[in-house]
């Protein structure tokens, strides 16, 4: 029997409270009917004895304590799912906003997902090619991995997200499809328009399902956005055998919405005002990436977050780093010199990279090239520090060679432009050309066989003659 409750006990910001209710569950959906017949959706966010607190999706403006009618639906929020979602644009709550009408649902699923038994997970292997050298060679993205991008306010993370969406691909295995689910939280209208325009102009929108939550949309919708996006991804991956890449931006906006939501409920704040359950809440999102035994599809995540004041110890990047399997860090100093993408190589890493590259996946020399580029670039930083103290002219020849390598590495390897899409072979060959500008004796992370095969000082000299 569907019981309707007339009247509200309290209205406080986006929250409403009802007393003398029974049989109500946490996270249950409800429909609120106003005096004028308008209907709004709400979600139960707190239950205590016979009192329930609900958050209204569209806000509480116009609600009355007396005549408002509330009916509970007896189930959590569910998302209508279909393969038709690819090529469509949805609100953060999963409603179509592209003017193309409703989708015809094949199934409905709880947006909170089903918890994955750790024993049923398969270790992620094989890689996703992004066409971006600094990612593919040095912080390789593996299928089923969760690899965040740590950015800062004003850096080019939106541009990088668009490039990844446009260029990302997998090696074709058994004709399996690859698609992208893109979730944007708290973005401005111009940024949302930029995403839509870029996807439409490049023709990739047909393989993308977009979930857009704008900065002026309700915060409860911002909290729902990543869950709706991941529910869509899980459906396509595990029921239609597709490989899905989920890009979520900006997780800092999500965390701030969670902080505001927690504050409105009167909860005791933790670090920097964020709720004490921020870690477990973020984990409930990030841990939905992976590969399941017996399933042919996979869900890979790239959460993007902006670090307030470029502080990597801020609670959001700090906790994200604990949960995820590496990070790609963008550097403001590189960005200011015009380098794009401004990936800071040394603090970036991919913890699952070693098991998804090499012979049979990318190329047999991939790990060695990656290790040697990391080691050489670390020595570049040492040489630059020394040069700032004693002057470049006083450096040894080896240190001068590293300074030149660093300049060439940033100019030709890290900086590759928005429209450049490199294959893994092109990336590794470029890495060898750069390493060939160094004395052969300095390349101690590469075995002799590959050194003889790929090292060519003459080729490097001709390639970088203008530099």
Predicted regions and their residues:
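Phosphate-binding/switch loop-helix module in NTP-utilizing enzymes
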Residues: 221-258
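The Walker A (P-loop) glycine that initiates the GxxxxGKT/S ATP-binding motif of P-loop NTPases
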Residues: 151-152
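Conserved P-loop
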Residues: 155-206
